[in-house]
From Swiss-Prot:
Annotated localization: Cytoplasm; Early endosome
Protein's recorded name: Ferry endosomal RAB5 effector complex subunit 3
Matching InterPro entries: Fy-3 (IPR019311)
Organism: Homo sapiens
Keywords: Cytoplasm, Disease variant, Endosome, Intellectual disability
GO cellular component terms, A-Z: cytoplasm; early endosome; protein-containing complex
Subunit architecture: Component of the FERRY complex composed of five subunits, TBCK, PPP1R21, FERRY3, CRYZL1 and GATD1 with a ratio of 1:2:1:2:4, respectively.
Length: 552
């Protein structure tokens, strides 16, 4: 049967088309190999161009060519089917084997016969955790997480102490060498010592990095196995003592770390809250907050000082697998790493506590790098194809050079997302790429940073993120050029743009109530903060308050 099919599939036939040009009768003969792999319309266009055929036969030629291909293909299929039936009747093909092959193919391609996919370990663990965190066992879970947090904190504290001692010792050595410079030592000796110091620091940092990585991996495995076991044991009504196994362990070392500055001290926050209404026909109500705070305050682990030891993150844990997620926007440069600036500070906070649900921040960034590399490769190949096809111009040349220069980086306005379960008040971080242009005072509503905010809000609507924190001035730190008029113009622009985006959200998600938090740097003055607070009700329609008085 396969031999017959191969013979039919490789058959060549001649397409003949006759037409008149004036008094001349012309004939077009084209050999075609069946089955014809090329689209009939494309083949027709090639024939018209290759043979310089007159335009008045274009439509008739296309119809004749299409009809010829359809008729000959159908004829081949009929002959192939007849040969297959003949092979079955003659016993050349095993009927039972053929039926089994058909049944298997049908079952694999038909949904109702397909085997249901088995739930993955991550899905099972997520369901179990969601059940437990909404049960009386939630306190037990948080106590266990806190004990793991204390363990990692002590490890980080030991690392910092050892690194500090190394730097102090190296500083003393370098100071002695500098005193002998020009006497018994040369610049080469200084450079050699500096290289040794750098190598020693790298070795020590790598040692502690590997130890932290190993400790968090062990904690994650132990925690997940313990959660599954706890869920199974709680189904047994006779086992009521398991929840008493986990007790909060105090950390004396943590107190010493606090003494040397490991605990972040919060500056006094300023905060204003507003309830607003958007829309004329479909009115939606949202909550707005204006805060003077560090963006990372929503990530750093805090203690509930009244109870003494428990992490202040119960609400974050309760909503981890819910439709009410919390996110924040970090302004980063175009390099996907955690080596400098707020990216390094954010990664440091992420490392303070093991993430029991998602990959480590380093692993997530590696995945983002691979995705960006693939996307850039695809865009570059498409752009190259368009240039090779003759559509190149000066603008496209500039785009090509720009794409090559930023081949492994994200562009301004683009963002990548990381997921977290180990931060204080957020689940999702949007890393929005901005450049130095945001520090100028002449950006518009079409600026990449503003459009990036729009796309972030759209992702919030489609992925159940109901609380989002945004840097109002599109900067995390103030500088000299950011005067009061600069701040007022920037805040007005962001307020108005976010208002428009929130009105768009009503059509995206049906008008779900959301909370948007606008953050300004901690170095901003109280006077400036209250000027921004007074601006907000002028742009958004704030709900009026109703004062009730009692009659005597």
């Amino acid at each position: 049967m396969k031999k017959n099919r191969e013979r039919f599939c490789n058959r060549e036939r001649e397409f003949v088309y006759k037409f008149k040009v004036g008094s001349q009768c012309l004939e077009l003969r084209v050999p075609l190999k069946f089955p014809v792999q090329e689209n009939a319309s494309h083949l027709h266009g090639r024939l018209m161009l290759l043979h310089s055929l007159p335009c008045f036969i274009e439509k008739d030629l296309k119809e004749a060519l299409t009809q010829f291909i359809e008729e000959e293909s159908l004829s081949d299929y009929d002959r192939d089917a007849e040969a297959s039936l003949a092979a079955v009747k003659s016993g050349e093909v095993d009927l039972h084997q053929l039926a089994s092959t058909w049944a298997k193919a049908y079952a694999e391609t038909t949904l109702e016969h397909a085997r249901p996919e088995e739930p993955s370990w991550d899905e099972d663990f997520a369901d179990v955790y969601h059940d437990l965190i909404h049960s009386p066992a939630s306190e037990t879970l948080l106590n266990l997480e806190h004990n793991y947090f204390v363990s990692i904190s002590e490890l980080i504290g030991e690392r910092d102490v050892e690194l500090k001692k190394l730097r102090e010792r190296q500083g003393i050595e370098m100071e002695k060498v500098m005193q002998e410079l020009g006497k018994s030592l040369t610049d080469q000796d200084v450079n050699s010592l500096a290289a040794q110091h750098f190598e020693s620091q790298q070795d020590l940092e790598n040692k502690w990095s590997n130890e932290l990585k190993q400790s968090t991996a062990i904690q994650k495995q132990e925690y997940q196995e313990w959660v599954i076991k706890l869920h199974q044991d709680l189904k047994n009504p006779n086992n009521s003592s398991l929840s008493e196994e986990i007790k909060v362990q105090p950390s004396q070392f943590r107190e010493s770390v606090e003494a040397i500055g490991r605990i972040y001290e919060e500056q006094r926050k300023l905060e204003e809250s507003f309830t607003i209404h958007l829309g004329a026909q479909l009115k939606t109500m949202h909550n707005l907050r204006l805060l003077r705070a560090d963006m990372l305050d929503f990530c750093k682990h805090k203690r509930n000082h009244r109870s003494g030891v428990k992490l202040h993150r119960l609400q974050t844990a309760l909503s981890l697998y819910s439709t009410s997620l919390c996110g924040l926007v970090l302004l980063v440069d175009n390099r996907i790493n955690s080596y400098s600036g707020i990216k390094r500070d954010f990664a440091t906070v992420c490392q303070e506590c093991t993430d029991f649900h998602f990959p480590r921040i380093e692993e997530q960034l590696e995945v983002v790098q691979q995705v960006v590399l693939y996307a850039r490769t695809q865009r570059r190949s498409k752009l190259k194809e368009s240039l090779d096809s003759g559509n190149q111009n000066g603008g496209n040349d500039d785009k090509t050079k720009n794409a090559e220069r930023n081949y492994l980086n994200v562009l301004p306005g683009e963002f990548y997302i990381t997921r977290h379960s180990n931060l204080s008040e957020i689940h999702v971080a949007f890393h929005l790429c901005v450049d130095d242009h945001v520090k100028s005072g002449n950006i518009t509503a079409r600026d990449p940073a503003i459009m990036g905010l729009r796309n972030i809000l759209k992702v919030c609507c489609t992925h159940d993120i109901t609380t989002i924190s945004i840097p109002l001035l599109l900067v995390h730190d103030m500088s000299e050029e950011m005067t009061i008029p600069w701040c007022l113009r920037r805040a007005e622009l962001v307020f108005k743009c976010v208002k428009g985006f929130m009105m768009e959200m009503a059509s995206w998600d049906g008008g779900i109530s959301r909370t948007v938090q606008f953050l300004v740097p901690q170095s901003i003055s109280e006077e400036m903060f209250y000027q921004l607070s007074n601006m907000l009700p002028q742009i958004f329609r704030v709900s009026s308050t109703l004062t009730l008085t009692s009659k005597h």
